[in-house]
């Protein structure tokens, strides 16, 4: 899998940030997140649809590498220019429904909106964060985990992962996100060999 914002989506993101937007979450069958996101992005020029993906560390036969995988299976974040009706956004190939709380139209607010804003800022991809050791403790210095430090509940220094707990739609989401060790050398940050 290789999800990333195209130049068209990057421009659309700038337009939405300038003009204002509403955010929603769609729910579909796991495995359809990429197909539906691509279809909606191609069919609606006022919309950004993105799954939430993460980079993960893997190792095979002593070789370390990173892979991209879906973090929230079945969920798609959708951002529409203010004033657009989410109910007019349709898929011709796949089923999805708009998640909503009781008595609302699905438009995100509060902590759910903050989370969706963070997903948009990350462009749907949680890259590998960077960390240093300070007195034997892990300190995140760059990347998506930097903004989630209050949500980190566990570190695996050996596997270079942090377990986070966040809440979306009142449900606790538990996930492991990767980091790489870096050295602080005379003020410059340099990547260590993997």
Question: What kind of region is each of these model predictions?
Answer:
Residues 1-137, 163-194:
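Acidic-enriched and Gly/Ser
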Residues 19-21, 141-149:
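Short coil-to-beta-strand transition motifs
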Residues 143-145, 155-160:
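Short, conserved beta-turn/loop elements at beta-strand boundaries and strand-helix junctions
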């Amino acid at each position: 899998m290789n999800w990333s914002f195209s130049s068209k989506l990057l421009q659309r993101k700038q337009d939405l940030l300038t003009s204002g937007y509403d955010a929603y979450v769609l729910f579909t069958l796991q495995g359809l997140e990429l197909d539906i996101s691509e279809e909606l992005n191609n069919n609606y020029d006022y919309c950004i649809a993105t799954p939430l993906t993460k980079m993960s560390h893997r190792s095979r036969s002593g070789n370390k590498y990173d892979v991209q995988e879906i973090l929230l299976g079945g969920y798609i974040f959708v951002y529409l220019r203010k004033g657009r009706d989410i109910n007019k956004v349709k898929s011709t190939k796949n089923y999805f429904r708009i998640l909503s709380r009781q008595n609302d139209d699905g438009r995100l607010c509060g902590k759910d909106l903050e989370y969706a804003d963070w997903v948009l800022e990350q462009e749907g991809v949680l890259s590998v964060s960077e960390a240093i050791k300070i007195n034997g403790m892990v300190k995140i210095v760059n990347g998506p985990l930097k903004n989630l430090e209050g949500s980190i509940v566990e570190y695996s220094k050996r596997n270079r992962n942090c377990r986070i707990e966040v809440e979306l739609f009142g449900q606790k989401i538990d996930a492991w996100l990767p980091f790489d060790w870096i050295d602080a050398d005379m003020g410059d940050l340099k990547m260590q060999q993997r």
